[in-house]
Amino acid sequence: MKARNLCLILICVSCFSTKLFAQSPGPVVQWNHDLVSLLRTPGAQPATIHPTRSMAILHAAIYDAVNSIDRSHAAYKVLLPGAPADASVDAAAAAAGHEVLLNLFPAFQPFVDGEYQQLLTQIPDGAPKIEGVQVGTAVADQIIQIRTGDGSGVTPPVFIPINVPGDYQLTPPNFAAAVFTHWPNVTPFALFSASQFRPDPPPALTSQTYTNDFNEVKTLGPPRSPAATSDQQLIGVFWNGAIQNYWNEIAQTAALSKQLTTAQAARLFALLNLSLADTVIAFYDAKYTYTFWRPVTAIRAADMDDNPDTQPDPNFLPETKTTAADPSYPGAHGAISAAGAAVLASFFGTDQFSFNLTSEVFAGVQRSFTSFSGASQEAFVSRIYAGQHFRFDQTAGAQLGNNVAGFVVTNLLH
């Protein structure tokens, strides 16, 4: 039975991995694509481990492996002494990715080994290839060791709601337990602390900001709202997936379009995923500091908020039917998308980039953008249209994501 289940899982990964690149993507983009595919596979990773941790470890290892040979920028954590200057950076990237993914996803060794062998066949045999593999493996082992005991593996404490207006309650219809309650205590990859850029508290329930944003999500956020345009309804559902996956796929498209070298791609994906990982740690710090209620709770219980300008709807559900199982403030999509757009615009020296993006939840449905910030802004408002967040959640999230990304690109991998 175990073997049968593993076979089914590997088939599922293969289904997610069928994207065909118009050109050889190189080891950095290929491993990124493979990791996104793994993370979309049910059961591939413990539900208590946030996917951005895996992404950051993978790309930190690849970057430091390549940079140990290339030495064009500062190391993230590891600058392997004595790495031959003529070693193959492609082999180093391939080996580093292989070592990390085997460590993080041991049940998927056949898939990971197969991808690794395909990458190695694209590299000429000889001493540079052998040396590159040695560098990549050694650096990856050190990065893995550095992240051991980072707090991600502890048992998440159970969140016990307090029945006070404004305080987070488990949400209908499933009333699932709050997730990632331990993530505020995970060691950041770059920040000094999880609270380094903690936003100010959410607005008071009787404030004009709260009133405006409450009524906005109440109006636009329910299923098939007559007040929402068909495009707003589509946007609300289009982005209702794992937002970090979208930004890694945008980076894949940009890296291939700009024909980045292996060293350039390694740096891009490291900056991106170190930023995203720390943004997640930072927003969970804020979420569990303020424990602010979700719109579905607020709208159903508006008769308890002492605000005469908010009216209850005891049957309200969001466009997406269910609500993410964590406090509302700050918003994750706003935070991650702002961080992703900021890193990409900084790396390429421009916000302008035309690309298509395929939805994770609407098979084959694409939307087109002409800038990174355009995609970020659409992801921001999508959570209002989806009935998931207040606008002030997303505003605070976007500021947090910008702050984290700014810190990373200013201080790391120069």
What are these regions (language model features)?
Residues Q23-H414:
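Acidic/polar surface patches and capping/hinge elements
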Residues T18-A22:
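Sec/Tat signal peptide C-region and signal peptidase I cleavage site
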Residues L6-S14:
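Sec-dependent N-terminal signal peptides
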Residues M1-N5:
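Positively charged n-region of N-terminal signal peptides that target proteins for export
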